[in-house]
Amino acid sequence: CKEKIEVLRCGLRAAEYPHACKNPAVFFNPLRQKIYDTCVRTLELCMHDHYEDCPWREQAMYALDSRNQMLCGYFAFGEFAFARASLELMCNDKGIDGYMTICFPTNFALKIPSFSLYWFMQMREYTEYSGDVTLVEKYFDKMQALLELFLSRVENGLIPNFYGDKTFWNFYEWSDGLSGNIFSEEEKRFDLPLNCLLSIAMSNTDFVRRVLGKSERYAQEKAALNDRIDETFFDAKKGLYRDFTDSKHYSEFGNALAVLCGAARGERAKRVGELISAKSNDLVPASLSTASFVYDAVLNIDKNRYADFVLGDIDAKYGYMLQAGATSFWETLSGEKDFGGAGSLCHGWSAMPIYYYHLLEQVRG
């Protein structure tokens, strides 16, 4: 074209998943309304052909990330086809050693063992909320085989970390001491989060067994594991559970898992709840990815007592991001400054307020 061209506008046309958002939630509290709406937008931005952690960096589906996303999506969108398609992709993972790969799909050899255990949680929650048992019917043998693979590593009642192998990354969350060492042959030790997640995976597998008309299989093994967790990791002086056998490291996340798996019981659980919900507790704080486990733990201890704590904590953290100009929620509270300037400003695992608002807030409409 020889004539001059005048560019009137440059832009992007969104191509979004065509979900039907049923009865958008309306709240009396304007801050919570803004948080909820931004969480829903964050979820939408992380939905393409499957759930993805973020829309600009890896664009990959991880088990922990997608567990948070799926649970929130059940409430925000009231549909299950997208979650099922994502779970089918995970269920067809072909890890050469039987453990799930770091994300789906991939031919990358790296694995995060704890993430394999979140898959059991995802399968249970999908079944519970959708009422569809055909997915767990189809992949029950895979669930059983993967759980048995983890249990085959148990030594003296506990599972050690995945040591001496660079293809395993002992990652739990992006917080001090819990992010592991990628591409490293770590030394052997026993980790509280891994053992608690294994205990929870046994509960989730027995739930699926009951749904499928099978007898429970893991109740005794779970009880024995919980006893060993309590014996090994509990620090009576602090009234807390330490994260590792080789160090005095205490986190909100690890202690929350001790409550959720049933290792912390009775007065010990109550004390843990008081400490992990305290403003100044000297514990490694839970990140946005795992704060939900802290919320679940204290709500399991006493829902009436801790509901305001959960809602207030969400107000503070998510209100901070909104005040900083967020139009979608971040990977961590450090925003783009994290990871050497590569922090994600739109991360699906941070949409968890959706679930807690439906659980605890008064919703209109």
Language-model regions, residue ranges each:
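Active-site core of glycosidic bond-cleaving carbohydrate-active enzymes
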Residues: 61-77, 81-365
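Short helix/loop capping segments that flank catalytic or ligand/cofactor-binding pockets
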Residues: 7-8, 35, 51, 138
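Structured secondary-structure scaffolds
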Residues: 25-81, 90
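Extended acidic/polar, glycine-enriched regions
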Residues: 1-34
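Short loop/turn segments at secondary-structure transitions that flank enzyme active sites
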Residues: 2, 16-18, 49, 96, ...
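A generic structural signal for short, non-catalytic loop/turn and secondary-structure boundary residues
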Residues: 3-5, 36, 95, 350
